[in-house]
Amino acid sequence: MPDHDSTALLSRQTKRRRVDIGVKRTVGTASAFFAKARATFFSAMNPQGSEQDVEYSVVQHADGEKSNVLRKLLKRANSYEDAMMPFPGATIISQLLKNNMNKNGGTEPSFQASGLSSTGSEVHQEDICSNSSRDSPPECLSPFGRPTMSQFDVDRLCDEHLRAKRARVENIIRGMSHSPSVALRGNENEREMAPQSVSPRESYRENKRKQKLPQQQQQSFQQLVSARKEQKREERRQLKQQLEDMQKQLRQLQEKFYQVYDSTDSENDEDGDLSEDSMRSEILDARAQDSVGRSDNEMCELDPGQFIDRARALIREQEMAENKPKREGSNKERDHGPNSLQPEGKHLAETLKQELNTAMSQVVDTVVKVFSAKPSRQVPQVFPPLQIPQARFAVNGENHNFHTANQRLQCFGDVIIPNPLDTFGSVQMPSSTDQTEALPLVVRKNSSEQSASGPATGGHHQPLHQSPLSATAGFTTPSFRHPFPLPLMAYPFQSPLGAPSGSFSGKDRASPESLDLTRDTTSLRTKMSSHHLSHHPCSPAHPPSTAEGLSLSLIKSECGDLQDMSDISPYSGSAMQEGLSPNHLKKAKLMFFYTRYPSSNMLKTYFSDVKFNRCITSQLIKWFSNFREFYYIQMEKYARQAINDGVTSTEELSITRDCELYRALNMHYNKANDFEVPERFLEVAQITLREFFNAIIAGKDVDPSWKKAIYKVICKLDSEVPEIFKSPNCLQELLHE
């Protein structure tokens, strides 16, 4: 018996292990084995009826095996589902074992000690009793005389066994075919059953199974993120393309706007030019009509060459005016097409041509009339409203120097007497090879003077720049006389439109001397002389002063080629002047040979013929500042040139009257070379040159203020200015000497 019990126990444990690891159990084989064992047991106990019992049990087992299994499966199918619902996340075997422990823990001590052994024996008893419970209940007794289990316990154990097998299959199927929806439902059930926590082993198994669930969710999330990024990238590309298109359209709009704006400006400029030409032609026509009514005796003293020059100027002006509309029309056709010329522009062009032709014919007729008149007969004035200065031809005809002076003044004719037709041109600032001097002071007329000279000017606009020829209106020259009223001579450079009159349209009109002269003279006038003329009419007892005195002596002093005109005195009068003249500029240049840093008191002493004020003083100081600037520039230039030539000592540097530096300085301050430069100036120039040489050799020119030390040395080398410079007629006296 003990051997039989130990063998049965081992078979039960082996069977239980096979159930735990999922090995399929053959029901028929196990039942036959147990049936044989039971038959042997009963035959030993009851030899008489053993054979009958064995046969009966075998038959009973063979007939009822399949029916019992099907019946139990169908009977407990619903109860299995109900039992599985409360434990969705736990292992079925663990739940069954736990239930068995709770149910049998108090009645079977052997089960508490060894759960696996008890369970195995119960299952074995279940198999035995389930086959013979209906026909032979007394036979299902334990060897120890223990009564067999009730039908309910047998059914329960069988149901639990089948439920465990089915749970294994379900777990396998569930692990293989999990979906996101199933995982989501499992998570919800887990949250609902969170209070019913299980053992750590069960939790580990559950977590291990759940770690595999979010893979599909993670993949779908990554796909969603990548799709979203691709969508954003596409939107960004489209926005960038739209921005580029808008920028391109903006550039096109800007180009169109600039084209329209430029075309509008060009049309306005052309219209303005045409209107200006039309106005000028109307003015010329009016002047020509006025000239017809003049008496012939007003031009008895005029130079016939003047009319030839005027005729030539008008011819050139007509040619330029006729060519200008053609050029403008060709430009407009090239830019905007052949039909873009407006009717107004065509009308203005035609009007301009007609007016120019009319004016030209009238001028030619007038010139022919003048030359066809008898010598003793006085011819009418051609252009009295122009108020042209007559410096070229206002000299007395009996003077033997007239023709010579007139010929020598040809190069300065346009400077002293500008063409009235050139007053419409633009003013070009002349350039000179010498250092640019400060522009002379400009003094404009006040309202009282304009009203006083209004009838004489014919109601024309006052010019911005007045003539320097009026500076000598207070001086008299008995050998000259002029037929025109003095108020007309006070403003010889006036133009009807008030434009500046010092224009240069030709390349051969200005030499360096004339350019420098014009720069210093075209913007000068004297208020004192104009005021004097407006209050002192012409009378035989007091002949009016003329403009030739200043202009001719000015040219003589600047150019030095009019020695026969040296007897003309620009300071024959003693009236005070309120402005600076070119003679004052010449005087200041000569004074620079003696003093480089004059004080304001010295200037007032040596320019006694000028009524000083703040502007006059500032202008004189500015002149000397420009003189010094040119002086120092030349010194530095020749000092560096000497260093480049290899000069190493200051003893090798000297200035003589034959050196190039002296000629440059003399040409600037004494252009006519009619003044003898004092020896003291040569000494000062030599000291200055050596100072610059030493400073450059020592490397002091790196400092921006390195010249200040030289200035301090040179300012102490000023010498006394001769007393002759205090006289208003100092230039005449110096030139005579």
From Swiss-Prot:
The Prospero-type homeodomain and the adjacent Prospero domain act as a single structural unit, the Homeo-Prospero domain (Potential). The Prospero-type homeodomain is essential for repression of RORG transcriptional activator activity. The modification Phosphoserine is found at residues 177, 179, 199, 291, 295, 511, 514, 557. It comes from Mus musculus. Residues 636-735 form the Prospero domain. One of its GO terms (molecular function) is RNA polymerase II cis-regulatory region sequence-specific DNA binding. Interacts with RORA and RORG (via AF-2 motif). Residues 1-28 are annotated as: Interaction with RORG. Coiled coil: none annotated. Residues 577-735 are annotated as: Homeo-Prospero. Belongs to the Prospero homeodomain family. It comes from the Eukaryota. Expressed in the young neurons of the subventricular region of the CNS, developing eye lens and pancreas. It is also found in the developing liver, heart and skeletal muscle. In the eye, expressed in the lens and retina at postnatal day 10. In the retina, localized to the inner nuclear layer. In the lens, localized to epithelial and fiber cells. There is a cross-link at residue 324 (Glycyl lysine isopeptide (Lys-Gly) (interchain with G-Cter in SUMO2)). One of its GO terms (biological process) is positive regulation of endothelial cell migration. GO terms for cellular component: cytoplasm; cytosol; nucleoplasm; nucleus. Its main location: nucleus. The lineage of its organism: Eukaryota, Metazoa, Chordata, Craniata, Vertebrata. Induction: Expressed in a circadian manner in the liver with a peak at ZT4. PROSITE patterns: HOMEO_PROSPERO (PS51818). The keyword S-adenosyl-L-methionine does not apply. It is found in: Nucleus. This is Prospero homeobox protein 1. Residues 723-729 are annotated as: Essential for nuclear localization, interaction with RORG, repression of RORG transcriptional activator activity. Residues 577-635 form the Prospero-type homeo domain. Transcription factor involved in developmental processes such as cell fate determination, gene transcriptional regulation and progenitor cell regulation in a number of organs. Plays a critical role in embryonic development and functions as a key regulatory protein in neurogenesis and the development of the heart, eye lens, liver, pancreas and the lymphatic system. Involved in the regulation of the circadian rhythm.
